């Protein structure tokens, strides 16, 4: 980009832009997009004023070449491009001679014909958005705003465009040329995305009373009053590099910028302790489903009817027994709860008309499992404020857990293809504009790659369970409602299929606030023997409930079937996000689209078809101890989708913190790989803030392990 700027713009403009950046302590070699933006803005300001004069009669005239002796005065005074001191001197002088109101911010030009200051904007975004930002910042009706975009759009105060059509067309053509030149060098995308909005300055308002006392009390050292501090902040000149800015700060601050080299970063320290356990709201790769193809039974589509029909496809039920108890729970209660579900489903069958929903009898085992009457009694604060030793109960620090191999296996499985399609190709009608055609083509290619993916099954399962649970929580607050865990898909031949994974029993659900918790017991079918990795199933009581005949290469084999039972809980806000898990498809589609865009911008034509159909090309998928893993574009789509789905399934404060903080190191490492010589301070503090998020969450621990692999290979 730097080379492009030096070739594309007049040397005088380049020099002025460099001076302006240095005045603000910015380096044109590093902030190359900003360098290009400043040059573009300067050039537009100069073009705006070029050839515009005022003659002896005070009329505005356009003269491109003519009599050098004619008594002409430049119509526009150029303020942009001067150093700050000189620029303010010019503004003050104009205000004194023309009685114009002094602007709060340095404008770009003064128009002697219209007697007004002019603010020129050049934007890579929508003109009206940028116009509003400018107007918000300036807050003055006296300054005229004129915005140009790289797409040929413009917007001006009161639609008064000041200049003639031809002068404005010259500016638009030049901007379009700059855009084309950038695109041909693959620079446009990065330039377009790097634009920041206008910073707005808050209005001054008076602070009085308690707030004023608090403000005075919380001033940094060395300041006697809020006024002093305000005056200091207003006069804080942001020139010079970061160190000089820091040295201008309080004497308490002392820090040095350390160079960041290949040897600076160290691997993250991951916690020790027992292996981490499964904590998703439903089973993932270990789930087993009973299915019916081409369902056409009476009441098809009513969850309870579908569930009963699915249950009838299995004939290997046996007397259930506990094979892996829950360490802390009353395990016979879980066993009795399952027997109760079977018995009450059987009772339904004996009724003439099966109801649409089923509320379970409030037995002692269900009351225990759903925590009925377990909430501590609430006491009015007035009744206990005189108790001298009143305190919040001590809570233990969470026990640290180490990374276990099962979470990587879960992730690998989520990226795989199943033999069913879990989403339909959306029919959105005929495309009207060419861009819609490209967009729907990309969507169709992406859908084809992910519709059979296991992560997509998890999305549909999550959406169904959360929707059903939220509905039941609102419709049957006091009831222990039985909710089947169902999903729907299509087979390879296009036949419809309904699947049952198990059941949920919901507890009392008077959910007033978003974070109020509803307890539920989940009971899920599986063929996974919990005794192989008992640490994985710490939160579950597992029963053996039947034997299933499986077809294998050597004939039929009988395998024990298990039921994974646990008490769990969720809240309105979690269910709301769970219902919106389809967003994961959108997020990963957008990531793929930006890859397609980058490819298209390099080649200067739409590369969607080649991108998805070139089966020989491989793309980086992720890091492993072996190095950078690569795969087909379909594999990339499915991996990105699985990451997005796992971020939703394993959402937690630990994940939020880890993602936000570790990203900072990734950005610094990227800057190092781009030879931008990054500098840092308090890198130890950054590591601390990342490592305090590594406690016991399986998905966060796996991401930390990937992060360490990335560091190893990125800095070789």
From Swiss-Prot:
Superkingdom in the source lineage: Viruses
UniProt keyword Amino-acid biosynthesis, yes or no: no
Enzyme class: hydrolase
Enzyme Commission number(s) of this protein: 3.1.-.-
Cofactor note text: Binds 2 manganese ions per subunit.
Pfam assignment, any one: Flu_PA
Residues annotated to bind Mn(2+) 2: 80, 108
Protein name: Polymerase acidic protein
Organism (species): Influenza A virus (strain A/Equine/London/1416/1973 H7N7)
């Amino acid at each position: 980009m730097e080379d492009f700027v030096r070739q594309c713009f007049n040397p005088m403009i380049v020099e002025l832009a460099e001076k302006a950046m240095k005045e603000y302590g910015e380096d044109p070699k590093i902030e190359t997009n900003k360098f290009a933006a400043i040059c573009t803005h300067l050039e537009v300001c100069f073009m705006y004023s070029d050839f515009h004069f005022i003659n002896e009669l005070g009329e505005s005239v356009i003269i491109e070449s003519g009599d050098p002796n004619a008594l002409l005065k430049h119509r526009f005074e150029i303020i942009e491009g001067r150093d700050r001191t000189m620029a303010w001197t010019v503004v003050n002088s104009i205000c004194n001679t023309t009685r114009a109101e002094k602007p709060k911010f340095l404008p770009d030009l003064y128009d002697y014909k219209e007697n007004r200051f002019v603010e020129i904007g050049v934007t890579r975004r929508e003109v009206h958005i940028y116009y509003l930002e400018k107007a918000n910042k300036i807050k003055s009706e006296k300054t005229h705003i004129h915005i140009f975009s790289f797409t040929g759009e413009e917007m001006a105060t009161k639609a008064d465009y000041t200049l003639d059509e031809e002068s404005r067309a010259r500016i638009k053509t030049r901007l379009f040329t700059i855009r084309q030149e950038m695109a041909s060098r693959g620079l446009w995308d990065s330039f377009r995305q790097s634009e920041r909005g206008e910073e707005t300055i808050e209005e001054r308002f008076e602070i009085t009373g308690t707030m004023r006392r608090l403000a005075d009390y919380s001033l940094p050292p060395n300041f006697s009053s809020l006024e002093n501090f305000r005056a200091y902040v207003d006069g804080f000149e942001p020139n010079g590099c970061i160190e000089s800015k820091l040295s201008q700060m309080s004497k308490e601050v002392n820090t040095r910028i350390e160079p960041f080299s290949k040897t600076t970063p160290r691997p993250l320290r991951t916690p020790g302790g027992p292996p981490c356990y499964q904590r998703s709201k439903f089973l993932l790769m270990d789930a087993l489903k009973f299915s019916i193809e081409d369902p056409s039974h009476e009441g098809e589509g009513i969850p309870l009817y579908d569930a009963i029909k699915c249950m009838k496809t299995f004939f290997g039920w046996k007397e259930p027994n506990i094979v892996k108890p829950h360490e802390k729970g009353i395990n016979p209660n879980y066993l009795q709860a399952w027997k109760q579900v079977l018995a009450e489903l059987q009772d339904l069958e004996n009724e003439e008309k099966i109801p649409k929903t089923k509320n379970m009898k409030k037995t002692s085992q269900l009351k225990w499992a759903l925590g009925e009457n377990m909430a501590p009694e609430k006491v009015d604060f007035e009744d206990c404020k005189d108790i001298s030793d009143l305190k919040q109960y001590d809570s233990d620090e969470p026990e640290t857990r180490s990374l276990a191999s099962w979470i990587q296996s879960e992730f690998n499985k989520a990226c795989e293809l199943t033999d069913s399609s879990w989403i339909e190709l959306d029919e959105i009608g005929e495309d009207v504009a060419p861009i819609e055609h490209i967009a729907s083509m990309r969507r169709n290619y992406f859908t084809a790659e992910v519709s059979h993916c296991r992560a997509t099954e998890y999305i549909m399962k999550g959406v169904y369970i959360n929707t059903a649970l939220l509905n039941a929580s609102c419709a049957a607050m006091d009831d222990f409602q039985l909710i089947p865990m169902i999903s729907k898909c299509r087979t390879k031949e296009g036949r419809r299929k309904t699947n049952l994974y198990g059941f949920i029993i919901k507890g009392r659900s008077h959910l007033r606030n978003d974070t109020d918790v509803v307890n539920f017991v989940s009971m899920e079918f599986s063929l996974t023997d919990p005794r192989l990795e008992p640490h994985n199933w710490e939160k579950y009581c597992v029963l053996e409930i039947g034997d299933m005949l499986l077809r294998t290469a050597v004939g039929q084999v009988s395998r024990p079937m298990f039921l994974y039972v646990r008490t769990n809980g969720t809240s309105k806000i979690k269910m709301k996000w769970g219902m919106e898990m389809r967003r994961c498809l959108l997020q990963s589609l957008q990531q793929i689209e930006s890859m397609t865009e980058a490819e298209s911008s390099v080649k200067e034509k739409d590369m969607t078809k080649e991108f998805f159909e070139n089966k020989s090309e491989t793309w980086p998928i992720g890091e492993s101890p072996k190095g950078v893993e690569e795969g087909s574009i379909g594999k990339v789509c499915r991996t990105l989708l699985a990451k997005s789905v796992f971020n939703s399934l394993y959402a937690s404060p630990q994940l939020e913190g880890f993602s936000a903080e570790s990203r900072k190191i990734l950005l610094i490492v990227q800057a190092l790989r781009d030879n931008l010589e990054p500098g840092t301070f308090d890198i130890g503090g950054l590591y601390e803030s990342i490592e305090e998020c590594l406690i016991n969450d399986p998905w966060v621990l796996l991401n930390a392990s990937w992060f360490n692999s990335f560091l190893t290979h990125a800095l070789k």
